[in-house]
Regions:
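Active-site beta3 strand of CheY-like receiver
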Residues: 10, 49-55
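Basic, Lys/Arg-enriched C-terminal extension of HTH/homeodomain DNA-binding domains
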Residues: 181-213
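Acidic catalytic/metal-coordinating carboxylates
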Residues: 37-38, 64-67
Length: 213
């Protein structure tokens, strides 16, 4: 089995010298780099599934990096984006962060600041993907619950005791305990705290939906 690939940094800048210099710097910390001179080609062809960070120049011929950033966010791209500019202003910085940038750095770029931003971005992306997978798994398990089990889950998340749940469902506490045990097994929850953490937001989301949605 081949070892997993290191995170991939997408470097988008129309200046060949800048790309070459930054690519060399980034590779020194074990990160892979893919260079792009054309932002349009990048948007069309980059790997959206892999772990990594996007480094995007603000000023490029024909299109602003801020426009590219807005397009990426609109398409649901989840890789963190580090913006670079040689002509930064407070307004430009504000617009970049408002559009979804993870970091905004001025050229000439401080090596340590850039590497720190990339390493933070990679950690952020890994955690984001892990949360997404946990949420996806939780939804899949929830879909296999019976109506009764979903009712029990909602009452657990609401903080009811076994006795209170028994009264609400018109069943004995022992029946509630059996339902809880089955629920914990089906949802692969190791503790009450884990169960609530994984499913509270989902229960709230589903409760807010109109009937039949």
């Amino acid at each position: 089995m081949s070892p997993p690939l290191s995170p991939l940094i997408h470097l988008i800048d129309d200046d060949d010298a800048v790309r070459s210099s930054l690519s060399l710097l980034i590779s020194t910390v074990g990160l892979r780099v893919q260079e792009w001179a054309d932002p349009h080609a990048f948007v069309r062809g980059f790997d959206r599934d892999g772990i990594g960070v996007i480094v995007l120049d603000v000023r490029m011929p024909g299109i602003s990096g801020l426009t590219v950033l807005a397009d990426l966010m609109a398409q649901g791209v989840d890789q963190p984006v580090v913006m670079l500019t040689g002509h930064g202003t407070v307004d430009m910085c504000r617009r970049a962060f408002k559009a979804g940038a993870a970091e905004f750095l001025e050229k000439p770029v401080d090596d340590e600041l850039l590497l720190e931003a990339l390493q933070n971005g990679v950690r952020q992306h890994v955690k984001s993907r892990e949360r997404t997978q946990i949420d996806r798994d939780a939804r899949a398990r929830y879909a296999h619950l019976s109506e009764r089990e979903r009712e029990v889950l909602s009452l657990i998340v609401a903080g009811l005791t076994n006795k209170e749940m028994g009264r609400a469902m018109d069943v004995s506490p022992r029946t509630v305990e059996a339902h809880r045990a089955n629920l914990f097994a089906k949802l692969e929850a190791e503790s009450l705290a884990q169960l609530v953490r994984r499913y509270a937001a989902l229960i709230d989301e589903l409760s807010a939906q109109p009937p039949g949605a």
